[in-house]
Amino acid sequence: MADFRSLYRHGFARVAACTTRSHPADPARNAQGILALARSCDEAGAAVAVFPELCVSAYAIEDLFLQVTVLDAVEAAIARLVAESEGLRPVLVVGAPLRWGHRLYNCALAIHRGRVLGVVPKSFLPNYREFYEKRHFASGAGIAGETIRIGGLDAPFGTDLLFSAEDVPHLVLGIEVCEDLWVPASPGTDAALAGATVLANLSGSPITVGRAESRAMLTRAASMRCLCAYVYAAAGTGESTTDLSWDGQTSIDENGVRLAEGPRFSAEPVMTLADIDLGLLAQERLQAGSFDDSGRGRALTYRRIPFRLAPPAGDLGLMRRLERFPFVPADPGRLAQDCYEAYNIQVAGLAQRLEATGTKRVVIGVSGGLDSTHALIVVAKALDRLGLPRTNILAYTLPGFATSEGTKANAHALMAALGTTAREIDIREAATVMLTAMDHPFGRGEPVYDVTFENVQAGLRTDYLFRLANQNGAIVIGTGDLSELALGWCTYGVGDQMSHYGVNAGVPKTLIQHLIRWVIGTGQFAPEVGATLAAILDTEISPELVPVAAGAKPQSTQGVIGPYALQDFNLFYTLRYGFPPSKIAFLALHAWGNAGAGAWPPDFPEPERGAYDLPEIRRWLGVFLKRFFGFSQFKRSALPNGPKVSAGGALSPRGDWRAPSDGSAEPWLAELARNVPET
């Protein structure tokens, strides 16, 4: 089995989009350049290397395509490519003019380890503006089940070819040529519906102002629509500039995301590499049944050509950008847009619920922590939007045995700054009465701070809030977040798990602090509100249920259930994609293994920019799996209403996540133990 750190072990494959220097009508020199770059792709561990359209002959040679000397030289160059590919790992996808029957075809050849796997002719030939391909070539549309003679051997020929790796799960290559992408019903779409997970596009495409942007839009859209990876390579330096110019654009997209793009207008050969996630694509197709449904009723009969890649077994790194915080993009513009949408989703959801019920007042518990703070500023904005006074927010802080003066002061300051109807109810006396009546050791004066001690406080707070809502004709606003729901870090029933409407239920913990920063930075409220919010951001995350000695650190949530940074990472890849624990650990190692590598979200505190090694990742992933799969589903099965916020998913039993309350975590824990090393 491949090393744990090998990308090929976890459903990835490395692909390359290449542009060589062209030599018009000189196939021998072009083959030499292709082979040089192919060797570099092999050294880089690539599985597929895509070259430009007609790269063996060059694209812009006009009527020289019809010269026997050129066509014979093309076949000789192909013979050399085939022979010298024998010691190379990647499937080489190259473009060449080939004779078949009585016509000439603009073809893409898939070459691997000393043989031509197959030849795909271009279907759609542009014959407008600067293009006049029909002068030289015939369309390959409709050609299926045929063979073509190359170097004395027959190879499959037609638009019905897919190339499938026997030893790399889900690596299935489909090919289209330049204009094939630009038509409404592209050959690549049919190939994807027939099973292709990687689409290669060999392109000539001379450059004009704005065309690079159009190509990028098309390739990204194709990868998203077809749930595939799209590898694009356009002709570049060396092509004839008699009437046109060339930029050599190369790009790799996956499911609507640009993974990599190479330099344009380069005088040197370009090799653009990225690691595509075949497992992700397979899961997307599995989850989105409409993808498979859309292929039914279409004549999609393809020949699958098998090959063995023999992928590298060692550590090649991972050539793709990974967000440390999958719910929090590092790009400032993207983060600002996400925060705008997330906040307004929450506000709009609550406003609609208040309108639908005719309720004018809300009750909310405010602790001075992140979750209740964010919930309160959502409530305030919702009432503003409905034209209701903020005095209709009945905000209560309910200090218990471990409530710190700092968090209580922050709660009072925020409630006052927002203009709510604020009140404090100390629950310690009521909690002591209950614990004494239960004959709990604490009621006898013993310092026993067990889960019962904690949940009596959490339950009393919720009990008060619901009775206050009854008394005032209001609804209770839940403040618990998506991360706490995933980990079961909430008190069930008469506790913080329950409310009339949970505004934070779709918001992960790692996003909440950025939402609050966005609220401050965009001036959603008066400056005094912003100052209080900034103070709250500096507070340690703690349930404040267990008393601590003077000067000691308060009870730490993350010390018990794990760092939210890692647990939100684990949640995202479990919920959104259903990845196995070993793959999640592999991804976490690349995202979190080096604090100095990659981008951090803007304004993320420098002292908190840490790293996690594999043993830490393994440990906290185990905690996540036990709590998520084996312990906490019963709490989510009775989840109150609240809006879905993130594309990463939500945990409502009426929406994204439906699971049995009596499930077991054992299969996931066994996979973790079996496939993730301890060091």
Predicted regions, residues:
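Enzyme catalytic cores with a strong preference for nitrogen-chemistry domains
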Residues: M1-G365, K381-R390, A422
